[in-house]
Amino acid sequence: MAESRAERKARRALIEAAEGSEDRKSSKKSKSPQDAKGKSAKGKAKAKRPGSRRNEDKASQTRSKRPYKNPVPSARKAVDPKSPCSIMKACGGCTALNRPYKKQLAAKQTAMEELFAALCGREGISVDPIRGMGVTLGDPGKYPAPRGFRHKAATPFAPGKEGAVRCGFFERGTHRIVAVPECPVETPGARQILNGIAREAERLRIPAFNEDKHLGLLRYAVVRCGWRTDQVMVTLVTAQRDLPHAQEFFEAVAALNPHIVTVAQNINGRPGNAILGEETRIVYGAECMRDQLLGCEFDISPTAFYQTNPQQTELLYQLAIDGMDLQQGDVLMDAYCGSGTIGLCAAKDAQNKGIGIMLLGVERNPAGIADARRNAELNGLTRSAWFMADDATDCILDAADNNERVDVLSIDPPRAGSTPEFLEAACALKPRRITYISCNPVTQERDLHQLLDGGYRLLKITPVDMFPHTDHTETVAVLERR
């Protein structure tokens, strides 16, 4: 299926955001470390339909024959010698790192306005100004370049000469590893832990995994750091369970930072590029690490979905919660709920305002549901929150068939968006409000047309810059029953 005109415009504008085409149109003048801050194997369940979160990257089947095309802009041919990142050209991750933050936001705003032009014209509204890190587009004054906002960091490992263990990032377009002494967009201290893991593996002669020959043991490491807490969790991904000097290695990893509360081992012996396998065990410390969002506490297990940029996550969630306009006695359905973060934050916010609601969370991954139930208990919401391990589409179809009551529906689907069946059932349920958080505005734009055709009007759509210096934008849409 060919791209729509709006999709082509959005893709072109996103590429301009990263390559700096607007810079070329304008004047050529340009004006602690924080201590790097956790249980069961990731559940596996087959759904009858696509449309529910499967993994941390929200990968899922798409409902359309045309796959989603994420535009990957080419890296700049030259790197500013004053660049804050010494490997920017080789890495290619932060393609707009050297571009003024205000211009990054302006380009993303243009892309979203072009993408949603037909919807906004249909509803007589405009796209809200993009919410950046610490600033909203249009604010007066300076727009400081965001740094240290990624609270999850990862590295692949590869064998080097004479038993060396190489770590860092894959060079752009290849699987060659580029060493990374420090990454300016990761929370300070995270990269030192990852590099330290490589050094300990070398010392104990634990061989890195060779993906071409499918030999070796150490494949990846993932570090997650708390934002409101100082807790750190490390997940070591190995090709098999048994390692030489295993206990010494695990203890050495735990000693790399005093705030490490959990070290987990994930076993992934399958070929391919997927980081995580299906078996996870705790080899040091607690089963989970803990963090906070919007005043709620969350236990995070090694394979749980949890946003990488918690500062912007709070903003994203608050926009959705405000759009829900929860009333006394409302039933809130949180579809694709993961570990329950959005629904629990909304329920807690209502509770703090003296508003009693009932929360129903739906997530296909049983491990995510286990986390959500534990998090409901952590936040004193066990009497008003229920979580089901089920496919979101199946669940909402059953609810519609049984004419069940849902007053507010929260949707946060994977990159492929929702399914036609889910959206049709959502309209049949007739919730008063729908909030739709999207990590892929292209598929969200498609889905919103179906919701509007099903009896809803679009009240507002707000872009959020979750990942500065990249072409990625997330959006929150608020809809109301006509």
Name each region found by the language model:
Residues 3-29, 35-38, 42-43, 47-59, ...:
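Rossmann-like S-adenosyl-L-methionine
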Residues 151, 230-232, 329-330:
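Nucleotide donor/acceptor-binding cores
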Residues 78-82, 89-208, 228, 243:
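Extended interfacial segments that mediate partner engagement and assembly in macromolecular machines
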Residues 214-228:
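Short edge beta-strands and adjacent turn/loop segments
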Residues 223, 230-239, 297-301:
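Short, aliphatic-rich beta-strand segments
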Residues 168-171, 237, 372:
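Short, acidic/hydrophobic/Gly-rich beta-strand patch recurrent on exposed beta strands
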Residues 148-171, 223-225, 281, 287-293, ...:
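Short beta-strand elements
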Residues 156-158, 224, 237-239, 480-482:
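Solvent-exposed residues in well-ordered beta-strands and their adjoining turns
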